[in-house]
UniProtKB/Swiss-Prot annotation:
GO molecular function: ATP binding; cysteine-tRNA ligase activity; zinc ion binding
Top-level division of the source organism's lineage: Bacteria
EC number: 6.1.1.16
BP-aspect Gene Ontology terms: cysteinyl-tRNA aminoacylation
UniProt catalytic activity: tRNA(Cys) + L-cysteine + ATP = L-cysteinyl-tRNA(Cys) + AMP + diphosphate
Motif 'HIGH' region, residue numbers: 31-41
Protein name, as recorded: Cysteine--tRNA ligase
Subcellular location as annotated: Cytoplasm
Motif ('KMSKS' region): 266-270
Listed cofactors: Zn(2+)
Residues annotated as binding ATP: K269
Subunit: Monomer.
Length: 494
């Protein structure tokens, strides 16, 4: 099966055929850098990071551009509130964004252009639109004339007349059509500005993405991405500006991620119902957050709640525990390396594991080829882990075959890990990290737990089972579960 992607432009899943064989040009709208990023922003960026990684894993050469919107009303407002220059705000939040993305394990895009570093390209594009009759000057502003661009609203499939009728916003009478949007904004006194043929001003939001995407990727490119909320007006306006200027199709595939919701409402700054990436990473491991964000298909809504993150943590822990068990099996009886597994000699459970592990790369590819279905891909990993647990718990001895099977599972999960950017940690240390995090929320210290475990071992040795049970129950009351084995006693948080 070849890769198929859901294209918002056609409303269908289509075969993905790059314009130039072997190469993919992809632009994703970045953040407006006026505040800390929330989990909705994390989702948009993680989703396209995985799409980027998957395309690369298919052997495609991907030119991935993600911008920073570093001039905007929201940035100016915050700068005024804090009494600093606009670029003190944008620079601060670019640094914060970069730090958040690095924590979430994102690969760097090929280019990360900033709007303010592309003013000449923006002015040239606006001038071209005026020269071609698609834009007009209105005082110190320049507007795009939507009626001149016939396919306007082809992405969101809205109707201009209906929208006009429905528009209750106060409309500037000087506009030729109420839906005309601004390409260049005249600077108000005290606002940052750049010189232009229309006076001192700054670019509108939509034009920057047309100018930067076409500069880095050409007039027509393969993929344009962003959150669903950008379909209208942002992407619709990008299409209008770019296609009106170039006379060519702008983008072949439009991909949009679904929202992170809280109580069925979009997480957003304006609603105030948001959690920043930093806040969440204070509490949860970054791999847990990434795991959570990829646990749903990228177009589906994703409900954010403490409970859902805790469930993601438990799910990830289950997989890592299996990876630790695999490592322990390999340590106790290393696979001699490269040995063939004789399938006919396997018992029923081993046979199932052998089959599921062997077919994992193919099933992963099928899931991802179906519009990047990371949820299904993760389901395949859980399925495999169930088989691993069964085989390891039923195995009477650590045989060479068992080690060879474990080595195969480890290698095949490893291949997927690189594309999803999860399961990449050293398993034992990840489990320790999770345990430490949970322990930090307990009302008992790790030292105290370990002291009690030592005391309990001594009590058991002295056959003082009353004291030993007392300690176990006391710890259980603190949500600590003890597990006795031949190697000693280990503990985990319930
Ligand atoms: N709740 C969300 N779920 C998924 N993606 C989101 C969410 N909120 C924003 N995004 C996406 O993040 C990217 C950056 O958005 P942008 O900087 O324009 O956000 P914003 O409009 O400032 O955020 P907010 O919506 O909170 O005001 C866009 O692709 C946007 O669609
Ligand atoms: Zn954009």
């Amino acid at each position: 099966m070849a890769l198929r992607v859901y294209n918002t432009l056609t409303g269908t899943k289509e075969d993905f055929v790059p314009i130039e064989p072997g190469k993919v040009k992809m632009y994703v709208c970045g953040v407006t850098v006026y505040d800390h990023c929330h989990i909705g922003h994390a989702r948009a960026n993680v989703v396209f990071d995985v799409i980027y990684r998957y395309l690369r894993s298919l052997g495609l050469e991907v030119n991935y551009v993600r911008n920073y919107t570093d001039i905007d009303d929201k940035i100016i407002n915050r700068a005024n509130r804090e009494g600093v220059a606009y670029d003190a705000i944008s620079e601060r939040f670019i640094k914060e964004f970069d730090r958040d993305m690095a924590q979430l394990g994102l690969l760097l895009p090929t280019s990360q252009p900033k709007a303010t570093e592309h003013i000449p390209e923006i002015i040239t594009l606006v001038q071209t639109l005026i020269d071609k009759g698609f834009a007009y000057q209105m005082g110190g502003d320049v507007n795009f004339c939507v009626e001149k661009f016939d396919p306007y609203l082809k992405l969101s499939k809205r109707n201009l007349e209906d929208m006009q009728a429905g528009a209750r916003i106060e409309v500037d009478e000087r506009k030729r059509h109420p839906m005309d949007f601004v390409l260049w904004k005249e600077a108000k006194p005290g606002e940052p500005f750049w010189e232009s043929p229309w006076g001192k001003g700054r670019p509108g939001w939509h034009i920057e993405c047309s100018a930067m995407s076409m500069k880095y990727l050409g007039e027509t490119f393969d993929i344009h991405g962003g959150g669903k909320d950008l379909v209208f007006p942002h992407h619709e306006n990008e299409i209008a500006q770019s296609e009106a200027a170039s006379g060519k199709p702008f983008v072949k595939y439009w991909l949009h991620n679904g929202f992170v919701n809280i109580n069925s409402e979009k997480m957003s700054k304006s609603l105030g119902n948001f959690f920043t990436i930093k806040e969440v990473l204070d509490k949860y491991d970054s791999e847990v957050l990434r795991f959570f964000l990829l646990s749903a298909h990228y177009r589906s809504p994703l409900d954010f709640s403490d409970q859902n993150l805790t469930e993601a943590e438990t799910g990830m822990e289950r997989i890592y525990k299996a990876l630790v068990a695999i490592d322990e099996t390999l340590a106790s009886n290393p696979a001699t390396g490269g040995e063939e597994i004789d399938a006919s000699s396997l018992g029923e459970a081993e046979r199932e594991l052998f089959d599921k592990s062997g077919s994992l790369p193919l099933r992963f590819r099928e899931a991802m080829d179906d519009d990047f279905n990371t949820a299904l891909a993760m389901g395949h990993i859980f399925d495999l882990v169930r088989c691993v647990n069964r085989v390891l718990s039923e195995a009477k001895e650590r045989s060479n075959t068992l080690s060879a099977l474990c080595a195969q599972v480890k290698a095949n999960i490893g291949k997927i890990a690189d594309v999803l950017g999860i399961f990449t940690s050293e398993p034992a240390s990840l489990l320790t990290r999770l345990k430490d995090r949970k322990a930090s929320e307990l009302d008992i210290s790790v030292e105290e737990i370990e002291r009690l475990i030592t005391e309990r071992a001594a009590a058991r040795k002295a056959k003082d089972f009353k004291r030993s049970d007392e300690i176990r129950d006391f710890l259980l009351g603190k949500n600590i579960v003890l597990l006795d084995s031949a190697q000693g006693t280990s503990w985990s948080v319930k």
